[in-house]
Amino acid sequence: MATYANLAYFADNGGVIQCVDLNNLKPVWSINGFDDIDATLTIDIENDKPYVYCGNEVDHQGTRGISKIKKIDGLTGEVIWEKEFECESLIGKSAVNGGLMATNVIGKNNIYNMAIFSLARYNGFNKGGMFALNKENGEIIWEKLFDNYMWSSPVDIYDKDGNGYIIQGDSAGYLHLIDGKEGNIKSSVLLNGNIESSPAVFNNVLVVATRNGTIYGVKVK
């Protein structure tokens, strides 16, 4: 769930995106999000107006489908723009879905014009992709393809000059440090298992856990 003033925004497994007034718990608007939505919605404020960024996974669509990434007017529910990406999914009792599973990054400082999304099972069943989209029109500013898919949410960090970097974990256990402006990988470290948790960062230290049950503290420099 994401909130702005008295408004709460959330989505469900059926793909419905909703806005509720917290003062009276009455719905303000709702729209069809196309498929299951697990990634937390994010909010960016432009000219004192909230805009919601979100996207769906590939679940009810079957083994192959579309992840639709949206920018939505937070007051009216109007879709400002929408971008489609074809992704794959493993369905069944042991489902491992693709599409947008990770919460996006709303850029700040020198990447203020970007919303950055990580997609699972994009460009190949076990692969993934990261996309920096222009907040204004949804056009791709840069993209980075990965050999492994990502469920872990990317995290943005900034140096003293305001230069943005993205930290991204993947399904093979790699933790990447990425130049937020250009999308180039600056450094990578291999941990001992699939990274599904999202890193927590304080100053120049990040903490993240793997599916093998290990918690790591990693220094960024």
For each predicted feature, which ranges?
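Extracytoplasmic/lumenal domain signature
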Residues: 2-221
